[in-house]
Amino acid sequence: MWTKPKFEEMRLGFEVTLYISNR
């Protein structure tokens, strides 16, 4: 299980990347 802060940061970055890519 990953650390909570790291998991949130990775997920946030992933979502942002997808958002920019979809733009």
UniProtKB/Swiss-Prot annotation:
It comes from the Bacteria. Coiled coil: none annotated. The keyword Mitochondrion does not apply. The keyword Cell inner membrane does not apply. Pathway: Cofactor biosynthesis; pyrroloquinoline quinone biosynthesis. InterPro entries: PQQ_synth_PqqA. GO terms for biological process: pyrroloquinoline quinone biosynthetic process. Keywords: PQQ biosynthesis. There is a cross-link at residues 15-19 (Pyrroloquinoline quinone (Glu-Tyr)). Belongs to the PqqA family. Required for coenzyme pyrroloquinoline quinone (PQQ) biosynthesis. PQQ is probably formed by cross-linking a specific glutamate to a specific tyrosine residue and excising these residues from the peptide. This is Coenzyme PQQ synthesis protein A. It comes from Colwellia psychrerythraea (strain 34H / ATCC BAA-681) (Vibrio psychroerythus). The lineage of its organism: Bacteria, Pseudomonadati, Pseudomonadota, Gammaproteobacteria, Alteromonadales.
